[in-house]
Curated annotation (Swiss-Prot):
BP-aspect Gene Ontology terms: animal organ development; growth hormone receptor signaling pathway; positive regulation of growth; positive regulation of receptor signaling pathway via JAK-STAT; response to nutrient levels
Disulfide bonds: 29-39, 89-205, 222-230
Record flagged with keyword rRNA processing: no
Protein name (Swiss-Prot/TrEMBL): Somatolactin-2
Signal peptide: 1-24
Keyword tags: Disulfide bond, Glycoprotein, Hormone, Secreted, Signal
Family: Belongs to the somatotropin/prolactin family.
Keyword NAD among UniProt keywords: no
Sites where a glycan is attached: 145
Length: 231
C-alpha cells in the first residue's frame, strides 16, 4: 500500500514537473565572469517578486521530496520518532527569529539577512544529500532530480537575495559563519538505518526552513506595499 502511494505520488510529480520548470522565472544573476551584474538591471519590485517565486517553488519541491523519501524509505513507527533521532536541525544555532511576534518586530534589513543566512547554510548540506542518496537501493530518479533541482535553485536564490540586499540596503554580500561539522563529521561506517534517519531529518529540516524563507520574503513584500497591515 505504501509503495502504491509512492508510485502514485511519483506519477503526479512527473506530470507536474514540466509545469514547474516552465513557470519558474529565471533568477540567474551571475555574468560570465561570476559577478552579480545581471539582476541589478531588474527593478527592485520585480526582483523581489522573482525571489519570492523561487522561494515558493523551492518549498513546494522540498515538501514533495520529503514526502517521497518518507513513503519510500521510512517505516511509519520511525516517522513518529524522527524528532527523537538525535539529529537536530543544522540551522538551530542561527540567530533567526522563530515566533510570529519576533518575526513581526525585526527590521527589513534583518529579514533579508535572515533569509540569506538560511539559504547559505543549506547550500552545502543539499550537495551532501545528493551524494548520500546514491547509497540507497532503488532510489527513484524523481527524488534525485528534485534534490538536484532544489540545490541549483537555492544557489540562484542566494544570488537574488544578495542583489536585493545591495539594492534595498546598499550593503555587500554577507557570508554565514556557520560550521557544518556536526553534519559532515566522519562516523566511520554507520548502519543504513542511521543514514536513512539522518537524511530524513535533513530533508525535514530543510522543508521547514524553506517555508520560513518564503514567509520572511512575503512579509518583506507586504511591508513594501503597506507596513501597517502585515501579519
Amino acid at each position: 500500500m505504501r509503495m502504491m502511494r509512492a508510485i502514485k505520488q511519483g506519477q503526479w510529480a512527473i506530470l507536474l514537473w514540466p509545469y514547474l520548470l516552465t513557470t519558474s522565472i529565471p533568477l540567474d544573476c551571475r555574468d560570465e565572469q561570476g559577478g552579480l551584474s545581471r539582476c541589478p538591471s531588474i527593478s527592485q519590485e520585480k526582483l523581489l517578486d522573482r525571489v519570492i517565486q523561487h522561494a515558493e517553488l523551492i518549498y513546494r519541491v522540498s515538501e514533495e521530496s520529503c514526502s517521497l523519501f518518507e513513503e519510500m524509505f521510512i517505516p511509519f513507527p520511525l516517522q513518529l520518532q524522527r524528532n527523537q533521532a538525535g539529529y537536530p536541525c543544522i540551522t538551530k544555532a542561527l540567530p533567526i527569529p522563530s515566533s510570529k511576534s519576533e518575526i513581526q518586530q525585526i527590521s527589513d534589513k534583518w529579514l533579508l539577512h535572515s533569509v540569506l543566512m538560511l539559504v547559505q547554510s543549506w547550500i552545502e548540506p543539499l550537495v551532501y544529500l545528493q551524494t548520500t542518496l546514491n547509497r540507497y537501493d532503488g532510489v527513484p530518479d524523481m527524488l534525485l532530480n528534485k534534490t538536484k533541482w532544489v540545490s541549483d535553485k537555492l544557489m540562484s536564490l542566494e544570488q537574488g537575495v544578495a542583489v536585493l540586499i545591495k539594492k534595498m540596503l546598499d550593503e555587500g554580500l554577507m557570508t554565514t559563519t556557520y560550521s557544518e561539522q556536526g553534519l559532515f563529521q566522519d562516523d566511520g561506517q554507520p548502519e543504513m538505518l542511521e543514514y536513512v534517519m539522518r537524511d530524513y531529518t535533513l530533508l525535514s529540516c530543510f522543508k521547514k526552513d524553506a517555508h520560513k524563507m518564503e514567509i520572511l520574503l512575503k512579509l518583506l513584500k507586504c511591508r513594501q506595499n503597506d507596513i501597517h497591515s502585515c501579519a
